[in-house]
Swiss-Prot record:
Expression tissues: Four pairs of lateral neurosecretory cells in the brains of late instar larvae, pupae and adults.
Signal peptide: 1-19
Name the record gives this protein: Pro-corazonin
Region (Disordered), start-end ranges: 74-96
UniProt KW RNA-binding keyword: no
Residues found modified as Pyrrolidone carboxylic acid: 20
GO function terms (MF aspect): corazonin receptor binding; neuropeptide hormone activity
Highest taxon in the source lineage: Eukaryota
Function in brief: Cardioactive peptide. Corazonin is probably involved in the physiological regulation of the heart beat.
Biased composition (Polar residues): 82-96
PTM-bearing positions, type Asparagine amide: 30
């Protein structure tokens, strides 16, 4: 009986030591890590606002808030500036290939007729 209690106490002690070693060696600090400064977060936010359109920012906020997917979220943002070349004397419109204004996809083109 005494050996069982002794073994139990040894296991508890080793588990406690291992947990504390993991806590301090791996950086598990319950969110109190000083790795991110508020200035870095502000810079990142400003960069996102410069890169993403207002529609894309709203979609990102919607997803980060954990709201369910719907048609509004899955639909494309109207980020392209399309123009049509219409000759007043001609009723035909020609398709004009204009680049999308997204910064992530450099080969994105939209067509207007």
């Amino acid at each position: 009986m005494a050996t069982n209690i002794t073994m139990f106490l040894i296991v508890i002690t080793l588990t406690s030591v291992a947990a504390q070693t993991f806590q301090y060696s791996r950086g598990w600090t319950n969110g109190k890590r000083d790795g991110h400064k508020t200035e870095d977060i502000r810079d990142l936010t400003n960069n996102l606002e410069r890169i993403l359109s207002p529609c894309q920012m709203n979609k990102l906020k919607y997803v980060l808030e954990g709201k369910p997917l719907n048609e509004r979220l899955l639909g494309p943002c109207d980020t392209s500036k399309t123009r049509s070349t219409t000759n007043p004397s001609d009723t035909n419109t020609s398709a004009v290939k204009t680049p999308c204004s997204t910064h992530f996809n450099k080969h994105c083109y939209s067509f207007s007729y």
